[in-house]
Amino acid sequence: MKRVVLFLLTNLAVMLVLSVSARILGVDRFLTSNGLDMGMLLVFAALIGFGGSFISLLMSKTMAKWSTGARVIERPANQDEAWLVDTVRQLSKKAGLQMPEVAIYDGAPNAFATGPSKSRSLVAVSTGLMQSMNKKEVGAVLAHEVAHIQNGDMVTLTLIQGVVNTFVIFLSRLAAYAVDSFLRRDDDESGSPGIGYWISSIAFEIMFGILASVVVMCFSRKREYRADAGAAALMGDRAPMIDALRALGGLEAGRLPKEMAASGIAGGGMMALFSSHPPLESRIAALESAS
């Protein structure tokens, strides 16, 4: 969950900065005396949208380390850290990947993988995860994160986010222009946008950005199933991944919880649309039914 949420928050912040900077520098040429130039607005939206998502991708590893306080293990300080590094090395070799950075941070049971490319990635594990699972289960979680890197999920997420950003910026400017036109006095023939346009464009950008995150989260949930399957393949057995999922939800074998909050796992209802992970029982069922 951390991987996706950090990316979304960074992306939103970068987009807002780029939008404000474009206004200050006067490069938002889509506003004319005759109204909006739709062609120029679309070009502007695409440049800011994809620019924001790719800048977020480049910043992803640095932001993840900073926000979690993760410490990259350069020289293992104990047997657990040595085991972590060795396990990630073995899994990466099986996946045909370069060795990613391995980090550890204090916190509740969780793990994530991030980075701008397969060759510049990071796998981070919380101390809570290490303390609450056995090594086979932790190994399955590590395999799941390595599978995310192998599948190129961060780059794919960036492309999807770029498309979503483009629509968010395009629609927010259209809505803001409509609001400004409604608020402008009939005797105002300057054609220049008023303060209502600039305030509402930022407000609409934030609102549409939050709503559009449903699309990104839907993609994330689908990739979780694929990462689960990838972990099972790397481990050579589905049982460790199933056991790890049960451990994340505080389960005993064969039992499923009514409510699941660990690691961004969603239950039902509207909030499930904003979850980066599918319901835990669905992930377990998918693994158990895999041929």
From Swiss-Prot:
Q: What InterPro entries does the database record attribute to this sequence?
A: HtpX_protease, Pept_M48_protease_HtpX, Peptidase_M48
Which residue spans traverse the membrane? Answer: 4-24, 38-58, 152-172, 199-219
- UniProt remark on cofactor binding: Binds 1 zinc ion per subunit.
According to its UniProt record, the EC number is 3.4.24.-
**Membrane topology reported for the UniProt record:** Multi-pass membrane protein
Keywords, A to Z? Cell inner membrane, Cell membrane, Hydrolase, Membrane, Metal-binding, Metalloprotease, Protease, Transmembrane, Transmembrane helix, Zinc
Q: Name one GO biological process term.
A: proteolysis
Cofactor section = Zn(2+)
Can you quote a single GO CC term? plasma membrane
Q: One Pfam match, by short name?
A: Peptidase_M48
Q: Does the keyword Hydrolase apply?
A: yes
**Which top class of enzyme applies to this chain?**
hydrolase
Record's subcellular location? Cell inner membrane
State one molecular function term (GO).
Answer: zinc ion binding
Residues that hold Zn(2+) according to the record: H144, H148, E224
Coiled-coil residues = none
Which residues constitute the catalytic centre? E145
The family assignment reads: Belongs to the peptidase M48B family.
The protein's name is Protease HtpX homolog
The organism is Chlorobium limicola (strain DSM 245 / NBRC 103803 / 6330)
